[in-house]
Amino acid sequence: LTELHQLPLNKNICSVFDIYLARVKRIATSLNAAFLDMGQDKDAFLHYHDLGPHYNHSRDYVNNTINKKSTRWNQLKANFKDPLSKDGLIDKVLKKDDTVLVQVSKEPISTKGPRVVAEISLAGRYLVLVPFSNRISVSQKIRDEKEKKRLSRLIKSIVPDGFGVVIRTVAKNKKVIDLDTDL
């Protein structure tokens, strides 16, 4: 996130993979979840498990960007020492009126609002880019160990620090220029 653009919001359209800057409206401790105001007609649902292991880094970066403090990516990129506990409680991480960067994972239906995740991923043709991660993984459908190592080595040489990558099956036998262009 190097720029923050605010666009007029269409309250009737909310699609999977859309990214929103949302505000915590209510914490539901019994569900270990939060309801978020994204500017839509219905509040979004964010479960604790959907925060992702590196939520704290994402939160700090977003808050620094909003508050116009230093937003240099390299100041937050490599410190992944303290991932969120898998069995934690949402009220220990979020509170009312917190700002959260989220991505829609399930569209709203009937009376329910959209389901969202705080672990953002940006899908391309050959790669899926995951900010605030340092993990590179290769599709399990690529069985050739030599090709897996080649792809991992290529991606490590081109991926920016502070980003993780999932290498998709269609990346098999692709040249570095194709992968770099997709990135």
Regions flagged by a language model, labelled:
Residues L1-L183:
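Single-stranded RNA-binding surfaces
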